[in-house]
Amino acid sequence: ARTDWLIFVDGDCVLHPRFVEMHIKYAQSGTILAGKRVRLSAALSERVMQTGKVPCLLPYLVCPRGCSHVEEGFFLYGAQWLRRGAKHLIGSNMSLSRTDLMAINGFDENYLLPATGEDYDIEWRMQRNGCKIVSVKNLAVQYHLYHKENWTNHDENMVYCKQLQAANQIVCKNGIQKL
């Protein structure tokens, strides 16, 4: 990366037109910006892929039709009183300072299984290193396209994570640098 602020997204997500703008606007060293995402149904995902546009989600609040977390899909700039805080990170909608990430040696490459561990690991190491989670819910809006999930048994990842926490290992050994 060539910038001082890093934004993380997944390839199976569609971003609101102001997604990047909001991550940049609220960027501040010592913070991790945490957003959420709407999980679109198979039918709505197909429609989005065909048209290139996300339709108005208001009807899906009343009748979700296979969608979930629809309330996360509304851009609410200037309505802080409507937004809830973020307690945890989702790796597909987060951003942070390159300097803060380098201080903990980046992502731990020992997490080999998908789905569980990586997001939580980066969250607790960054927080232990003094960073705070700041919510960009309903600002950095993201839509997750439907696909079959490929969840595996993640017990191995969680055991590894708990070992690192018990040892208070904030700087990972198998990250950007191999220590």
Placement of each model-derived feature along the sequence:
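A short, conserved alpha-helix in the catalytic core of glycosyltransferases
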Residues: 88, 93-105, 112-131
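The conserved acidic donor/metal-binding loop of glycosyltransferases
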Residues: 10-14
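Catalytic core of nucleotide-sugar-dependent glycosyltransferases
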Residues: 116, 139-140, 153-178
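Short, flexible, basic/aromatic active-site loop/helix in glycosyltransferases
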Residues: 53-86
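Short aromatic-enriched loop/helix-cap "lid" or pocket-rim segments at secondary-structure transitions
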Residues: 44-48, 147-148, 154-157
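Active-site donor/metal-binding and catalytic loop motifs
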Residues: 40, 136-153
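Conserved donor NDP-sugar-binding/catalytic core segment of glycosyltransferases
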Residues: 18-58
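Short aromatic/hydrophobic "clamp" motif used to bind/position activated sugar donors
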Residues: 6
